[in-house]
UniProtKB/Swiss-Prot annotation:
An example Gene Ontology biological process: glycolytic process
Disulfide bridge partners, by residue number: none
Protein name, per record: Glucokinase
GO molecular-function term, one example from the UniProt record: glucokinase activity
Alphabetized InterPro entries for the sequence: ATPase_NBD, Bacterial_glucokinase, Glucokinase
Gene: glk
UniProt catalytic activity: D-glucose + ATP = D-glucose 6-phosphate + ADP + H(+)
Length: 328
């Protein structure tokens, strides 16, 4: 992150969620008021600075002094080299080039975690559990392109998001079927992380492993095709795949809830679950989530929410920027 000593946190503020394919930009024009959202293809711009300038010109924004970018990358210092796109840049040099007083960067899933604190009840669908305990830790997990994992803990300064790489922890198979699937993945990849299964590619991997177990040679299917055939009843194998995927998610989510003591709730982000909402309510997820022996009652009380807001990375970046400006 980079700032000059400044002291008035003015609006509008520039907020962005930058992935390998698209960069989403918006202006925060007042506290929690997000306007003029736009999506720019990353491939159309040589540098992140070019993309920012194009958005600012398009939106007609003037006098922007503060900005925050959520980005699909670990943030380990001033230099950012995107892992899934060619953009590489210095945060401080970018701040100076754009004439900003403040520019902060944060991991995209850390931003999604912070967005949970800004999300209204209409953008949450509860799946089991009771009421959240106020100010208790919250767990945030998001199967999508990869598997994002974070947590939120409350401090005197507000909610703090935990930045980590929990999606790459080792996956724990629960039953004999999952052991077979895990063995298939281990033979293929060596280390089997939670993300190997709990992602778009992971859904395809579970499908592939089940087909191999049945000595079948099914057609190659995209994750969206697997879910479509599972929900329509067109493929029992796809339905079994989706059931196992949701059960696996229940295991990993409950492990995270126990680790954090997340009596403030578990929040499911990412692009996969919102596409199968009605199915998910009665999927194996919740029963697996609670299946923890002596801690079954503890987990049964924890509410799980599916986050439905469209651009959580944007609102999370705005929350991070606000926290930063309050504390400089």
């Amino acid at each position: 992150m980079s700032s000059t000593p400044n002291k008035q946190a003015g609006y509008p503020r520039l907020v962005a969620d930058i992935g390998g394919t698209n960069a989403r930009f918006a202006l925060e024009t007042a506290p929690r008021v997000i306007e003029k959202a736009a999506v720019l293809p990353c491939k159309d711009y040589d540098t992140v600075t070019d993309a920012v300038r194009a958005y600012l010109n398009q939106s007609g924004a003037t006098a922007v002094r503060h900005a925050a970018f959520a980005i699909a990358n670990p943030i380990l210092g001033d230099w950012v080299q995107m892992t899934n796109h060619h953009w590489a840049f210095s945060i401080e040099t970018t701040r100076q080039t754009l004439g900003l007083d403040t520019l902060i960067l944060l991991n995209d899933f850390t931003a999604q975690a912070l967005a949970v604190t800004q999300t209204s009840s209409k953008d949450l669908m509860q799946v089991g559990g009771q009421k959240p305990v106020e100010f208790a830790p919250k767990a945030v997990i998001g199967p999508g392109t990869g598997l994002g994992v974070s947590g939120l803990v409350h401090s005197h300064a507000g909610w703090v998001a935990l930045a980590g790489e929990g999606g790459h922890t080792s996956f724990p198979p629960f039953d004999d079927m999952e052991v077979l699937i895990w063995q298939y993945a281990k033979n293929k990849y060596g280390h089997v992380s939670a993300e190997r299964f709990l992602s778009g590619a992971g859904l395809s991997l579970v499908y592939e492993a089940l087909a191999a177990k049945q000595k079948a040679k099914p057609a190659k299917l995209m994750p969206s095709e697997i879910t479509e055939k599972a929900l329509s009843g067109a493929s029992p194998l796809c339905r079994q795949t989706l059931d196992i995927f949701c059960a696996m998610l229940g295991t990993v989510a409950s492990n995270l809830a126990l680790t954090l003591g997340a009596r403030g709730g578990v929040y499911l982000c990412g692009g996969i679950i919102p596409r199968v909402l009605e199915y998910f309510k009665t999927s194996p997820f919740r029963s697996r989530f609670e299946n923890k022996g002596r801690f079954e009652a503890y987990l049964a009380a924890i509410p799980v929410y599916v986050v439905l807001s469209e651009f959580p990375g944007i609102s999370g970046a705005a929350a991070a920027l606000d926290n930063h400006l309050r504390n400089v």
